[in-house]
Amino acid sequence: MGSSGSMVKPISGFLTALIQYPVPVVESRADIDKQIKQIIKTIHSTKAGYPGLELIVFPEYSTQGLNTKKWTTEEFLCTVPGPETDLFAEACKESEVYGVFSIMERNPDGGEPYNTAIIIDPQGEMILKYRKLNPWVPVEPWKAGDLGLPVCDGPGGSKLAVCICHDGMFPEVAREAAYKGANVLIRISGYSTQVSEQWMLTNRSNAWQNLMYTLSVNLAGYDGVFYYFGEGQVCNFDGTTLVQGHRNPWEIVTAEVYPELADQARLGWGLENNIYNLGSRGYVATPGGVKENPYTFVKDLAEGKYKVPWEDEIKVKDGTIYGYPVKKTIHS
């Protein structure tokens, strides 16, 4: 294992570890059980190496892998909460850390499954459950999330939100997290190298546009088809990169995070306090700023009428290119 970043817990704020987990090659339920044991082992060993560690993050697909021929089968799916999350909860409690985990979740109402992330606290309680709002279509078959973008209390004065991989390419997702009070946005990903530059760019822009820290980590290594880039990244609230990992499987990227500084920027900045300025436009000329929405896409999206001008000419609107049948029934 290699490591990049900080070694000790700061007096204020918290120490985080982003695990560039090797992409799992999963063929059976036994392989999933093996990954769960490995993740738990990694929690304990990382805590032993970094006694001040308070938040450990595992990337998307680290539990169940990316076997596209089997990933929606009953054998591969998990219930949330369920036996697998109970094991993660026990490990977090034993090591006294917050943990972020990836689960491909069986739909409790039937129909297509969800791509889910959870946060477990040092008491072993699941304090956040998030379902990916924007599956990476047309590759992914997951149902779009229906839990919104929840925020929870975390270590060192943090307010945590989680997004999953492709979610982070949408500035609206990061803005929603910040608008609901998050000062730290965690992004867990399973991207291959084709979008590594865009991934790093959006991690920075999501931080800057919302005056919040972003903690992002991707799978690492080769699964026989694609190479996954790792490159764990911690961005400051001003959009600069504090720590950047490499493309090594098992690299541990650590950083000291100071949520209070993001909070102070949101309260004290005039110039570039853009999350506030969005809803208070031109407050020098107009006391309190202009509140009315000037954005057509926001209005149309809210009314369920979002449509880009070239929509009728778009070529790919279903999953047939990746072998998924066109759906005949729409699940609510």
UniProtKB/Swiss-Prot annotation:
Record Pfam families: CN_hydrolase (PF00795)
Active site: 60, 132, 165
The reaction(s) this protein catalyses: formamide + H2O = formate + NH4(+)
Domain CN hydrolase, residue spans: 14-259
GO molecular function: formamidase activity; N-carbamoylputrescine amidase activity
InterPro entries: Aliph_Amidase/BUP, C-N_Hydrolase, C-N_Hydrolase_sf, Formamidase
Protein keywords: Hydrolase
Gene Ontology biological process terms from the UniProt entry: putrescine biosynthetic process from arginine
Source organism, top-level taxon: Bacteria
Keyword match Coiled coil: no
CDD domains: aliphatic_amidase
EC id: 3.5.1.49
HAMAP family: Formamidase (MF_01243)
Family: Belongs to the carbon-nitrogen hydrolase superfamily. Aliphatic amidase family.
Physiological role: Is an aliphatic amidase with a restricted substrate specificity, as it only hydrolyzes formamide.
Protein name: Formamidase
